[in-house]
């Protein structure tokens, strides 16, 4: 049932105040090389912006395509969760001294990821062609969750194997 999935979705909810970040902040300040900081900084700056684009997709396009109340509730909840994640990453970026948005615009790798994501989002528009909608959902989900976020999480987890960024 849609309502059961909605409940599970809300039970997975977290706020930045529930995620311990202090040990990672200390690692950043004391244990990471400038190369490691550059890698992690690029990922974190990208996360904050990616979450914003993903929010736009769920709340703008998906809610337009599917007018069923349960799907609208799911999509707006997804969008709301993305704003919470974006806030968490923004606060972490600020704490690490990565809060200058113009730096994000100068980071070619991060900017290219976001531009590709926005191109996928924008290429399908708001028309209700079910084949195009299915294609959009598949590509957008695979790119954002698969290629962009999970590959970045894999890089971050590799630091944990080195006993860094354990939080």
Residue locations for each model-derived region?
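Non-heme di-metal
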Residues: 1-167
């Amino acid at each position: 049932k849609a309502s059961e999935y909605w409940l599970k979705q809300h039970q997975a909810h977290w706020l930045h105040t529930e995620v311990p970040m202090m040990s990672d902040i200390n690692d950043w300040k004391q244990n990471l090389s400038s190369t490691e900081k550059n890698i992690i900084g690029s990922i974190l700056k990208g996360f904050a912006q990616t979450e914003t684009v993903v929010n736009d997709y769920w709340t703008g396009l998906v809610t337009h395509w599917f007018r069923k109340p349960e799907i609208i509730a799911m999509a707006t909840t997804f969008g709301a969760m993305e704003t919470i994640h974006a806030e968490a990453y923004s606060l972490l970026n600020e704490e690490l001294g990565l809060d200058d948005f113009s730096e994000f615009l100068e980071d070619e790798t991060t900017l290219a990821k976001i531009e590709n994501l926005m191109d996928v989002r924008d290429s399908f528009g708001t028309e209700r062609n079910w084949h195009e909608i299915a294609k959009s959902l598949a590509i957008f989900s695979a790119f954002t969750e698969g290629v962009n976020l999970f590959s970045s999480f894999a890089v971050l987890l590799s630091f944990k194997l080195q006993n860094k960024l354990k939080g």
